[in-house]
């Protein structure tokens, strides 16, 4: 298994950017892969491109627009408003069915062609917002499936799986990239960079985590 190279599933948001710089500390060669699935917050792809260009990281954007046709949701459809809070039952309407399944599967195909075994993704079960494809059991299951499907030894690594947003901010701080993550990323479902709209679930979670992180710094 090649332990010197890694591919990061990279959206241009807080979590994946933190994982990208975490990977740069651990591996000699890091490649970032993003997806265009006709997301409303497509400005995140511009953030991803800008970050990779600025910090000299090889970057690829794969076309997955088909996902928008298959799975109507508030992240890809202009006529669906993003839920401001998670529903009591079921998944939020911002959940894109099959997104992480497809992202990781396509990245695995890409990785195998490059002779890379390690795939890094920023999913977290601690702050998973009700998304079933961010759970550890799903990632472990998919890892086994991909290995069997392609007769290849992949290792899917999830640095944020068991930490919350405050701890993710602390990781960025410890890596020396806090300002990059704070100012140059886009997490907002409404496509507003840095602090975002302040109203969507992603912005609320990001802000709550940052305030908790600030308290940690003061102690």
From Swiss-Prot:
Pfam families linked to this entry: QueC
UniProt cross-references to HAMAP family, sorted A to Z: QueC (MF_01633)
Keywords (A to Z) from UniProt: ATP-binding, Ligase, Metal-binding, Nucleotide-binding, Queuosine biosynthesis, Zinc
Gene Ontology terms for molecular function: ATP binding; ligase activity, forming carbon-nitrogen bonds; zinc ion binding
InterPro entries: QueC, Rossmann-like_a/b/a_fold
Biological role: Catalyzes the ATP-dependent conversion of 7-carboxy-7-deazaguanine (CDG) to 7-cyano-7-deazaguanine (preQ(0)).
Protein's organism: Clostridium botulinum (strain Langeland / NCTC 10281 / Type F)
UniProt-recorded name of the protein: 7-cyano-7-deazaguanine synthase
Reactions catalysed: 7-carboxy-7-deazaguanine + NH4(+) + ATP = 7-cyano-7-deazaguanine + ADP + phosphate + H2O + H(+)
Co-factor: note: Binds 1 zinc ion per subunit.
Binding site for ATP: 10-20
Enzyme Commission number(s) from the entry: 6.3.4.20
Domain of life: Bacteria
GO terms, biological process: queuosine biosynthetic process
UniProt binding sites for Zn(2+): 188, 197, 200, 203
Cofactor(s), by name: Zn(2+)
Pathway: Purine metabolism; 7-cyano-7-deazaguanine biosynthesis
Family: Belongs to the QueC family.
Subunit and interaction comment: Homodimer.
